[in-house]
Amino acid sequence: IYLMDEPLSSLDAKLRGDLRIELKRIQSELGATTLYVTHDQIEAMTMADRIGIMAGGRLMQLGTPREIYTTPANIHVASRLGQPAINLFPASLVPGKGIAAGTHTIGARTEHLKIAPSASGNGRIERVEHLGDQSHLHF
């Protein structure tokens, strides 16, 4: 068993990306069990077979990266993975659902949202982050 506590945290972004691939290759080649501690969600998602999300010393959820991303156990888990972060808002903002204020929260990831034509919605874009392959709009 290999234990690693944030081994890539002090490296620059390019080297960190290169070493993620190399560490995963070595781990697969050796067939070794590795317990890898990180606060970097990209490291967790790309390197792990299973991820454990902790809060206050307690395990909130254990599962594959895809399971945790698509079916988080709670708001804490949902807010830990995804770039950009999940959008959370009170369910009472959804018209016509009859949900009492403060009882439920809706989480929406950006890949599941569509920008409405101006005739059917309103909003104002405050900032745009151009990232090359994608752009993040901030409302």
Regions found by a protein language model. Name each.
Residues I1-H76:
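ABC ATPase nucleotide-binding domains
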Residues T64, H76, P90-S92, N122-E126:
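Residues located in well-ordered beta-strands
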Residues M54, R80-G82, P90, T105-R109:
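Short, conserved beta-strand edge motifs with alternating hydrophobic and charged residues
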Residues P84, P95-F139:
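Non-catalytic connector elements of ABC transporters
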Residues T70-G96:
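C-terminal boundary and immediately downstream tail of ABC-type ATPase nucleotide-binding domains
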Residues R50, F89, A119-G121:
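Structural detector for hydrophobic anchor residues on beta-strands
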Residues R50, Q61, R80, T105, ...:
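Short glycine/serine/threonine-biased micro-segments
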